[in-house]
């Protein structure tokens, strides 16, 4: 069965801020709306009233308010008539939003869909569960919302990093292997930054000054500049004290950010005279034992590649979300991805991992890589807590289209 084509005509993302860092004054909806406005500004042929719906990822929704995707849409200037859906598939939320947007266009229910995701991990609150019924006696415990709803496997009641340690042991990756992967991620990201590779995808954010201080313009991912190779190599393990391999610097960080893409049908592409950046060629999703979520992309990526009518060797570049260095290493080995094709501008270890944003962010960066490094086919995959993963394949089809 031949599916109707779905085109990506614009992308944009915020810089990625560190935890309690440069973007911490911005909410989920601020970050998402900034990315959406920037993406739509690149395609002036599309007016706000032309957009049929928005599908947007977000994981840590406590204290964000009702209907987060709807907030993003209205804050971005989209009309009251906009259909809005918020997606929570943990770290794959942003990618799942893209897949759903594409499916809705294929089904004929929408012609123009804004998709993506955001997260403000800095603004995620602590919870006080006992306050609802009244703490009658003794201490009242606060629960960390970031950890509870973002980083804890509910079945094993263990942190994601413990699963990363299991993955490293199961697949034979040492501390040195993971440190070297992380160092390469930082170096690739630093090189891409210095060469201006991210300029086309990042929409700078202006933070208003207060008490007479000037505004601050944030243009780059905050984590990249924090790289210290000696400190990375000497860092203590976090999740397993004895013979552990996973450290804070060889894993992704807690971050803030947003990313957005504009998808259109072929009919709208022609009607509005839009130049396609890429075509969505296929997607795939998979799941396995919850605590082995780390290697779920090894199932999802081949499914996406097959859905696109390709084989892995025909894909020019890959993006795998680096939740941990071992995630990149293990899935590359299992899928047989040459490391020179993987995350060529660095990954989440160096750039950061705002949970609901990352699945969309890696598609945005993959498109940058295809455009600037001369690739045709690209595949992106992201694991998610609970044992799942999502993957997508895109094809660069118009060399004249500007990011």
From Swiss-Prot:
Subcellular location: Peroxisome
Pathway per the UniProt entry: Metabolic intermediate biosynthesis; (R)-mevalonate biosynthesis; (R)-mevalonate from acetyl-CoA: step 1/3
Annotated organism of origin: Candida tropicalis (Yeast)
Name this protein carries in UniProt: Acetyl-CoA acetyltransferase IB
Biological process (GO), any one: fatty acid beta-oxidation
Lineage of the species this protein comes from: Eukaryota, Fungi, Dikarya, Ascomycota, Saccharomycotina
NCBIfam families on file: AcCoA-C-Actrans
Enzyme nomenclature, EC number: 2.3.1.9
Reactions the enzyme catalyzes: 2 acetyl-CoA = acetoacetyl-CoA + CoA
Claim: Acyltransferase is one of the keywords in the record: yes
GO molecular function ontology, one term from the record: acetyl-CoA C-acetyltransferase activity
SUPFAM superfamilies found in the cross-reference section: Thiolase-like (SSF53901)
Family: Belongs to the thiolase-like superfamily. Thiolase family.
Motif range (Microbody targeting signal): 401-403
Record keywords, A-Z: Acyltransferase, Peroxisome, Transferase
Catalytic residue positions: 91 (acyl-thioester intermediate), 353 (proton acceptor), 383 (proton acceptor)
């Amino acid at each position: 069965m031949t599916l109707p084509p779905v085109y990506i005509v614009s992308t944009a993302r915020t810089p990625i801020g560190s935890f309690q860092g440069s973007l911490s004054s911005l909410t989920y909806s601020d970050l998402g709306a900034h990315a959406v406005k920037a993406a739509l500004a690149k395609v002036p042929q599309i007016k706000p009233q032309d957009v049929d719906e928005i599908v947007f990822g977000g994981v840590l929704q406590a204290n964000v308010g009702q209907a987060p995707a709807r907030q993003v849409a209205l804050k971005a200037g989209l009309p009251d008539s906009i259909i809005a859906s918020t997606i929570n598939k943990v770290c794959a939320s942003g990618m799942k939003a893209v897949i759903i947007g594409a499916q809705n266009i294929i089904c004929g229910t929408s012609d123009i869909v804004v998709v993506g995701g955001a997260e403000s991990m800095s603004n995620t609150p602590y919870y006080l569960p006992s306050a609802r019924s009244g703490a009658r006696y003794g201490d009242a415990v606060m629960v960390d919302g970031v950890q509870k709803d973002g980083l804890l496997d509910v079945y094993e009641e263990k942190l994601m990093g413990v699963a990363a340690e299991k993955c490293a042991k199961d697949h034979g990756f040492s501390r040195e292997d993971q440190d070297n992967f992380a160092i390469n991620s930082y170096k690739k990201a630093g090189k891409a930054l210095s060469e201006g590779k991210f300029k086309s995808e990042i929409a700078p954010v202006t933070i208003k000054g207060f008490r007479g201080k000037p505004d601050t313009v944030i243009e780059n991912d905050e984590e990249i500049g924090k790289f210290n190779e000696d400190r990375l190599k000497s860092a203590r393990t976090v999740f397993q004290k004895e013979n552990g391999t996973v450290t804070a610097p060889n894993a992704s960080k807690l971050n803030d950010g947003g990313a957005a893409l504009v998808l259109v049908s072929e009919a709208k592409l022609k009607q509005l005279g839009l130049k396609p950046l890429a075509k969505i060629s296929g997607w795939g999703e998979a799941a396995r034992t919850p605590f082995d979520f780390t290697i779920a992309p090894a199932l999802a990526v081949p499914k996406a590649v097959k859905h696109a009518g390709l084989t892995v060797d025909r894909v020019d570049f890959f993006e795998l979300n680096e939740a941990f260095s071992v995630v990149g290493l293990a899935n590359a080995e299992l899928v047989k991805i040459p490391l020179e094709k993987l995350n060529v501008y660095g990954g989440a270890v160096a750039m950061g991992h705002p949970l609901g944003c990352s699945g969309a962010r890696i598609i945005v960066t993959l498109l940058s890589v295809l455009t600037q490094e001369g690739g045709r086919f690209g595949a992106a995959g992201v694991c998610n807590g609970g044992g799942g993963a999502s993957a997508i394949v895109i094809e660069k089809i118009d060399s004249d289209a500007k990011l």
